[in-house]
Amino acid sequence: DALPKEQQLKLLGEIQEDSEWLIRMVENLLSVTRIDGAKVEVVKTPIVLDELIDSVLMKFSKKHPNQKVITQIPDEFVDIPMDSLLIEQVLLNLLENAVFHAKGMTELTLSVSLVGDKAVFEVADNGCGIPDDALQKIFSGSYEKSAAPVDGTRSNMGIGLSVCAAIVKAHGSEITAENRKGGGAVFRFALERGGEDDGQ
């Protein structure tokens, strides 16, 4: 049976919106990951933290409606200069990485804390954790399926995480990963908060 016209128009609108977002994201991503020996810089615009997190959660819930994400963000107003499309993609990649690879996960958390003049982003899970021998090379793109446990957990992470690392590096920061004492893994990066350098 054909969908009602109103629903068809709504779906078409969502498809167009997602397509335009994807095109912009890919264009920005290509500018960050190009290999030409030049220093890569991103165009930063002050972004309200609440709006960024809401956008990430909305996109994530469309693909993973049954996966709850616990959020912990400051109550105060926070703006952060960034390329929001790329930072959204980093957070989405990290959340989806947990869904696909954190075997045994029952809790997924996205948190932001303020430390001095920085906003520290963390994506944490309570799943299987990351093999110790993989932690040092997990962002290099060389962590292939053969390096993962035989049961396939935490496999095929290298390419996506290397892109995350490139995006964060282009923002003047570094992404790290470590295993949690209580089980699972946490991925972390920090961005400068809004101030004198907004928009640069």
Tell where the protein language model's regions lie, with residue ranges.
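Short alpha-helical segment of the dimerization/phosphotransfer core of two-component systems
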Residues: 17-22
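Conserved micro-motifs of the catalytic ATP-binding
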Residues: 37-42, 79-82
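A conserved beta-strand-to-alpha-helix junction within the catalytic ATP-binding
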Residues: 43-57
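Conserved catalytic submotifs in the C-terminal HATPase_c
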Residues: 45-46, 68-78
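Short helix-loop "hinge" at the ATP-lid/N-box region of the Bergerat-fold HATPase_c
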Residues: 98-99
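Short conserved segment of the HATPase_c
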Residues: 130-142
